[in-house]
């Protein structure tokens, strides 16, 4: 779907499906990158958004979710914030079955990016993905080419 529709449309469809299925009020704001993003960067952004929404549906009980995609000359940032139950991030990351959180972080690292999780029990969760622009592969200063 991502390859056929492009990142912006794929994200909007993902969010629409999430809203329809789970009923949480969902806002999406975007200032898409000025340049075409390489396919690996688009995939990471989409998969992190998808995993965040899946986690909201499975664990948080949130009634409101805000997603934003912003781009500057130095970075591309995806932020997903909810008003749900929150959790203890250190405990969740150390669990043997926390493949989703670990997978998101691994995807970010592969492109020289970072993934941060700001949460606490009862306080909701904010997941922030930062990818360098131009996106780099494995921390090396080289562009990824489609």
Regions found by a protein language model. Give the residues of each.
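Coiled-coil dimerization/phosphotransfer module
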Residues: 1-146
């Amino acid at each position: 779907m991502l390859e056929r529709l492009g990142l912006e449309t794929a994200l909007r469809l993902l969010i629409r499906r999430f809203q329809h299925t789970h009923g949480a009020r969902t806002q999406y704001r975007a200032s898409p990158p000025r340049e075409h993003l390489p396919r690996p960067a688009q995939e990471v952004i989409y998969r992190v958004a998808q995993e965040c929404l899946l986690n909201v549906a499975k664990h948080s009980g949130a009634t409101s979710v805000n997603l934003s995609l912003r781009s500057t000359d130095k970075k591309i940032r995806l932020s997903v914030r909810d008003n749900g139950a929150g959790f203890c991030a250190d405990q969740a990351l150390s669990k043997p079955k926390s493949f989703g959180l670990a997978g998101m972080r691994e995807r970010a690292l592969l492109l020289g990016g970072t993934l941060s999780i700001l949460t606490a029990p009862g306080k909701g969760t904010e997941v922030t993905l930062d990818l360098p622009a131009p996106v780099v592969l494995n921390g090396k200063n080289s562009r990824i080419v489609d």
